[in-house]
Amino acid sequence: MEQYQYTSEYSEMPVIKQDRYFSKIHAKHQAAYGDFGAVNIRDNIVSTFREALIQERNPSVSNNVLLVGKVQSGKTSNLELFTALAFDNGFNLVVIYGGYDSTLLGQTTNRFRKTFDIPSETDYSDSSPVIFSSDDSKQLLSVDNEIFEDLLAANKPVFLISMKRPAAMAKVNDLLQRIDKSKLRAFIIDDEGDQASLNTKKNKATDASATYAEIVRMKKQLGDPLYLSVTATPQAIIFLDEYSELRPDAIRLIEPGKGYCGAESYHLFDSDSIEIISDEDQQELTNGKMPGTLRAAICHYIISSAIMCKRGKNMSDMIIHSHRNVSNHSAIYQCVDAFVQAFKDDIMYNNLDALKTRFEELEKCYIR
């Protein structure tokens, strides 16, 4: 099987600047994920960005990069820091394909707007980035070459965030066609790059499906920019044939942060995190009785919440999904609520005998 590797023989190791945008986003990651989590993102992305620049300078390979992350492992946080690093190192335009409907597009837009402190109204008196979204057709149509030149003159990086649908992407392509692109240094982020982006036509050498065609058109307009395809399920992209203009020439792993719990933690039969509930316990719960396994689960939740609280995280949630029928949920809720309320009452009224029993139950759960 062909391996996706390249060497840096065409250029010396690039110097990476960690300037204003990098400092801002890294500080936000420190506040959100702690020093360890933020450093994990920083180290991964600085290395990824450096390798991407080396790849960009190598004329024998494409500028397509496949970024593989695990499900819900913080891929977007990594992309935030990659974007910040790009802005600090001469890139002034990022195109993001942000979902397949207005809700997902809005989530992506709001996430980057909040992270980069982008005001809703463009202010030319500072150098904060600006966002244009395919969801606002009137705004996109109003953008012309003069506006883009003013933004670049003010050192304001530009986000173009598009729904991953042909009509929406065509709006962005039409905008790019209207402007002078000679001063642009762009890169593309294709979130969930294995969904909708790939060419679904049978004869891939001559035909192109609609979304794929718009991506290819955009890449050509931007002069073959860095194209980051991001996914947790990379199989379809890895096996793209030579006809695909999205075929990656490098693959990078987005390392999950410390404490990440993914599929391998919960969906393996021999996992220590899984306890099989007996039919008898399920029937007890349906009948409104508290089975021992649910008591143990709640004790585990209480202990975990206490540890989180000690670490400064004051919000936690537990989901109990024990029956497919909604009609059974009320009985289950009453059972759990009675257990929790009794626990609270024992604490409130300092019921020492009951608290001793509960402490022993918690201790047993903790040392399992």
Region annotations inferred by a language model:
Residues 92-123, 232, 324-327:
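Conserved Walker A/P-loop ATP-binding site and its immediately adjacent core
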Residues 27-68:
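Conserved pre-motif I regulatory segment
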Residues 78, 82:
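Hydrophobic positions on the alpha1 helix immediately C-terminal to the Walker A/P-loop
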Residues 248-335:
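Conserved interdomain linker/interface between the two RecA-like ATPase lobes of SF2 helicase motors
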Residues 119-171:
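Inter-Walker segment of RecA-like/P-loop motor cores
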Residues 68-71, 100, 194-196, 211-242, ...:
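Conserved helicase ATPase motor motifs in RecA-like P-loop NTPase domains
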Residues 179-216:
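SF2 helicase catalytic motif II
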Residues 109, 118-141, 185-189, 193, ...:
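Conserved C-terminal RecA-like helicase domain
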